[in-house]
A protein has these predicted regions:
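Generic C-terminal helix-cap and adjacent flexible tail
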Residues: 148-155
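A short coil-to-beta-strand element that immediately follows conserved catalytic motifs
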Residues: 63-77
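Short secondary-structure boundary/capping segments
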Residues: 4-6, 15, 92-94, 113-115
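Conserved N-terminal beta-strand and adjoining loop/helix that marks the start
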Residues: 2-23, 44
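Active-site-adjacent beta-strand/loop module that shapes the phosphate/pyrophosphate-binding cleft
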Residues: 75-111
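NUDIX/MutT-family hydrolases
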Residues: 100-106, 112-143
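Short connector loops at helix/strand junctions that flank enzyme active sites
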Residues: 9, 36, 95-99
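Conserved Nudix-box catalytic region and its N-terminal flanking loop in Nudix hydrolases
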Residues: 18-64
Length: 155
């Protein structure tokens, strides 16, 4: 009986930004590419929002539930083929991942505490420059949608 624990092919992408349209990017330790916070569900019962909150904490040290922060489910999902180099993490019959997009508005740029095993650097960039720096097309597209979410007031 195979007891291998595979990654769940459901993940989040969290665009972290300020009201001034500054976007946080973090550099992956394994590939050296820049991205927003991403990560898979830990278990099937974990909600999209729980995954987003956990991944933000793990990858940046930020508390997405802080009263001055606003986590918003952008109600967008990207479905894409899993890169061949990463397929070994998933069940052999899995080839596609569903990624739910969130935005996390901070009151201003904040210091970041990286998980060194996952990321090596962080930077705040203007939203358009951040989109240009992203390795992932879906990440860049999400960042380019930022102006529409900045016009919506926080609850």
């Amino acid at each position: 009986m195979d007891e291998t624990i595979y990654k769940i092919p459901e993940s989040v992408l969290v665009v972290i930004y300020t009201p001034q349209r500054e976007v946080l990017l973090i550099r992956r330790a394994d590939a050296g590419t820049w991205q927003s916070v991403t990560g898979s569900k830990d278990h099937g019962a974990e909600t999209w929002a729980e995954t987003a909150i956990r991944e933000v904490q793990e990858e940046t040290g930020l508390d997405a539930q802080h009263p001055e922060c606003h986590l918003q489910d952008w109600q967008l999902e990207n479905v894409y083929d899993i890169y061949p180099a990463w397929r070994w993490r998933y069940h052999p019959e899995v080839s596609r991942n569903t990624e739910r997009v969130f935005g996390l508005r901070l009151p201003q740029k904040m210091p970041i505490t990286l998980s060194p095993s996952e990321h090596t650097e962080w930077q705040w960039l203007d939203w358009q420059a951040a989109a240009d720096h992203c390795f992932s097309a879906s990440n860049a597209e999400a960042i380019l949608m930022l102006p529409r979410y900045l016009s919506e007031p926080a609850p």
